[in-house]
């Protein structure tokens, strides 16, 4: 599912809301999650999961084509840990 499909589905299930309003809400939610993560904050949605940022230390990598060693800089990467409700649902648990 892509963002536009999510917006259409939410608008369909909530006929009292205009699609443009749903789009603003969804975009605001994503933007707030991004802003929080950019500050280094953790965003927890109970039952669904938690978004956080993990630091990957600098390391020496290898160019797969040439086999030469390459320095890989330290970087911060997004991380998502699933919540129990989501894991249970994916594994055939309660609906």
UniProtKB/Swiss-Prot annotation:
InterPro entries: Hist_DNA-bd, Histone-like_DNA-bd_CS, IHF-like_DNA-bd_dom_sf, IHF_beta. The keyword Transcription applies. GO terms for cellular component: chromosome; cytosol. GO terms for molecular function: DNA binding; structural constituent of chromatin. GO terms for biological process: DNA recombination; regulation of DNA-templated transcription; regulation of translation. Pfam families: Bac_DNA_binding. Keywords: DNA recombination, DNA-binding, Transcription, Transcription regulation, Translation regulation. CDD domains: IHF_B (cd13836). This protein is one of the two subunits of integration host factor, a specific DNA-binding protein that functions in genetic recombination as well as in transcriptional and translational control. Involved in hydrogenase gene expression. Heterodimer of an alpha and a beta chain. Belongs to the bacterial histone-like protein family. This is Integration host factor subunit beta. The gene is ihfB.
């Amino acid at each position: 599912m892509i963002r536009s499909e999510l917006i259409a589905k939410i608008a369909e299930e909530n006929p009292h809301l205009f699609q443009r309003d749903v789009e603003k809400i969804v975009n605001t939610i994503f933007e707030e999650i991004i802003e929080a993560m950019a500050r280094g904050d953790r965003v927890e949605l109970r039952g669904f999961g938690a978004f956080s940022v993990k630091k990957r230390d600098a390391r020496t990598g290898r160019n797969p084509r040439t086999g030469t060693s390459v320095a890989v800089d330290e970087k911060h990467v997004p991380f998502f840990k699933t919540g129990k409700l989501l894991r249970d649902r994916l594994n055939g648990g309660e609906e």
